[in-house]
Amino acid sequence: MADQIPSWSSFRLYYFRHFKGDPQKEIAREGLTAYQRNNRPLYGSAMQYRESVGCYQVDETQGDIYLVSKWDRSKVIGRPNVYLAIDTASGLIAGVYVGLDAGETALMACIANAAGDKAAYCAAYGIDLSPADWPSRGLPSEIISDRGGEFMGDRINELCICYGIDRQALPPFRAEEKPLVERAMDLIQDSYKSMLRGRGVIGDDVGERWATDYRQQAILTLDEYTAIVIHTIIALNKGRVLTDIGHLPVDAPNTPAQLWKWLTDQGKSTLLDVDADELYRRAPGDSADRST
């Protein structure tokens, strides 16, 4: 057995190669961005980044489904854009925009939704909402996003200056810095894909040769799809069990909606209370040039 025991130098080499690599060597070999994304030390979960509600992670994706016009269901209108705002401390999906617009207009609509009355928003789509299931209301005090054009544009900059909102723009290719909103996007789309197969949902073979033309399967309108997204958000807010809240007391709730209420009841909130009409008046809008 003694001849099978590695020498100290061999053990040390194995340990540093497989368990404790030299950061400088890894950076030289893979680059700083790859090291920060995949190999840097982690000292906690994303939800430990903030102790109070009011810091929102914001992102956008294109829905994996084709939609039709509500005026003429034989006409395909394309794929919707989905914007989400997720509270960092509670994991609650605080705001959403679903539509064909993209860019700053859609982003402002998502932030306005996060600040507004969710019961009225849901009622517009025929959904009866209990306020406890989607309790978020108010502007965030901090916004975390990537460096997309809509997140770095003049309109969001004016809004942040107007209300004193802090803004953090992440470096390129660093989606892991806002994991809550990235995961929420996947959860929402994965929740309905299996139920809507054959109804315009895009499969994994999209773009491949001889792949199905999913546009021909589209049957849902934008309003119908939006209602599905809203139902999914409500279910995630009130029923999803959070697993990364070990930093909180044992009596803390483990679902986003209940954790939001628990934090706000303790005064741990940095939300900015604004009136919906005031926000509409003060929110920056698009500009247009008059032409002949």
Q: What residue spans do the PLM features occupy?
A:
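Short, flexible loop/turn elements at secondary-structure junctions
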Residues: 15, 59-62, 86-90, 98-102, ...
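Acidic/histidine-rich, metal-coordinating catalytic segments
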Residues: 123-151
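Mobile-element integrase/transposase regions
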Residues: 13-84, 92-93, 104-110, 191
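RNase H-like two-metal-ion nuclease catalytic core shared by retroviral integrases
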Residues: 143-146, 153-163, 167-212
